[in-house]
Amino acid sequence: MSRRSTAEKETAKSDPIYRNRFINMLVNRILKHGKKSLAYRILYRAMKKIQQKTGKNPLSVSRQAIRGVTPDVTVKARRVGGSTYQVPIEIRSTQGKALAIRWLLGASRKRPGRNMAFKLSYELMDAARENGNAIRKKEETHRMAEAXRAFAHFR
């Protein structure tokens, strides 16, 4: 039996301007090659663009986008008797948010456009309006989970 105690989960710190942990999570996913100041600049420019385009609070728009993209279930590959099944599993809210952020950034990187701030702002606005590639990814995941519901007992 192990004498070691379980490590406590570190809480995400909040960003300096919006004082929001979700924004900091987004910045950490935008981050490339340790250039955090560049990641902050990209995100804050995207927020400014959202403010100009919608006239709404950019924080509420991004929260709405995350809420729209967060999946309830996902599929996990399980190997049973020589064949692999896609088994649907429910996911926790923190894991769902992490997936949603990853999908939003992936969709915005694939978007055609000038710069990352521009692409991210439009992807967040689209996700808040319930369309865009990130929303499509969530719906596709839910469809896969629904199709593989027969294998749910393999959990």
Curated annotation (Swiss-Prot):
The keyword DNA repair does not apply. It is found in: Plastid, Chloroplast. GO terms for cellular component: chloroplast; small ribosomal subunit. Its main location: plastid. It comes from the Eukaryota. InterPro entries: Ribosomal_uS7, Ribosomal_uS7_bac/org-type, Ribosomal_uS7_dom, Ribosomal_uS7_dom_sf. The keyword Plastid applies. GO terms for molecular function: rRNA binding; structural constituent of ribosome. One of its GO terms (biological process) is translation. Keywords: Chloroplast, Plastid, Ribonucleoprotein, Ribosomal protein, RNA-binding, rRNA-binding. It holds the Pfam family Ribosomal_S7. One of the primary rRNA binding proteins, it binds directly to 16S rRNA where it nucleates assembly of the head domain of the 30S subunit. Part of the 30S ribosomal subunit. Belongs to the universal ribosomal protein uS7 family. This is Small ribosomal subunit protein uS7c. The lineage of its organism: Eukaryota, Viridiplantae, Streptophyta, Embryophyta, Tracheophyta.
